[in-house]
């Protein structure tokens, strides 16, 4: 992908992110969030799931200076479809990072997947945004745009506790997730305004 961006190949890359290697047995990936239980980061009496923070692929990709990048959620399909339409009209490498829950890996009923994809945005652990490179924005270094900011975040605790993969998290660990979210949003509001 980095090479395609460097060459500015005319391709739309969609990253389908279910926050682990779900199709091979639910192993941790660099996109697995802190505290999530996987088969390679179990949670129980002596272990607490994934101990690292989720890599921010959207910002890593944007740092390459490609023409267009975005984040999306299957819980906000209209936003996702608008971004697909936008990307379709741009020449060069485009990237859309889509959060899409997995019933088995997330430990929640299939009927709740769209709700979870909406909840992760509403509680602020996933944001909907776009990046336009210099070619599109005319601004050196490109521009970031936040597409949706909840007036007030819903409960991180409720979001995490609704999934089996986070059931072992302590109150202190949930507080850490909330503080990490708050720090990220402070950076977004400061740097993307």
Question: At which residue positions do the language-model features occur?
Answer:
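Short C-terminal domain-edge/linker segments immediately following a structured domain
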Residues: 16-20, 42-47, 125-131
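Short acidic, glycine/serine/threonine-rich loops at helix termini
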Residues: 1, 23-28, 106-111
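Thiamine diphosphate
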Residues: 1-23, 75, 79-82, 87
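Conserved thiamine diphosphate
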Residues: 30-90
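Flexible, low-complexity linker and terminal segments
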Residues: 100-193
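Short, conserved beta-strand edge motifs with alternating hydrophobic and charged residues
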Residues: 15, 69-72, 95-99
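Short acidic/glycine-rich loop or secondary-structure boundary segments that cap or lie
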Residues: 22-23, 78-80, 96, 103-107
């Amino acid at each position: 992908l980095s090479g395609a961006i460097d060459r500015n190949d005319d391709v739309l890359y969609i990253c389908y992110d279910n926050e682990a290697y779900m199709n091979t047995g639910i192993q941790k990936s660099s996109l697995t969030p802190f505290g999530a239980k996987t088969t390679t980061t179990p949670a129980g009496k002596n272990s607490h799931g994934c101990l690292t923070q989720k890599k921010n692929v959207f910002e890593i990709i944007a740092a390459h200076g490609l023409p267009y990048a975005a984040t999306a959620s299957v819980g906000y399909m209209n936003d996702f479809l608008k971004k697909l339409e936008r990307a379709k009209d741009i020449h060069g490498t485009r990237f859309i990072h889509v959060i899409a829950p997995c019933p088995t890996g997330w430990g929640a009923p299939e009927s709740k997947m769209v709700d979870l994809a909406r909840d992760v945005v509403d509680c602020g652990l996933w944001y909907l945004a776009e990046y336009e490179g210099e070619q599109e924005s005319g601004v050196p270094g490109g521009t970031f745009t936040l597409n949706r900011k909840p007036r007030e975040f819903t409960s991180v605790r409720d979001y995490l506790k609704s999934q089996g993969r986070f059931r072992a998290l302590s109150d202190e660990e949930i507080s850490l997730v909330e503080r990490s979210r708050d720090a990220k949003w402070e950076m977004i509001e400061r740097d993307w305004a």
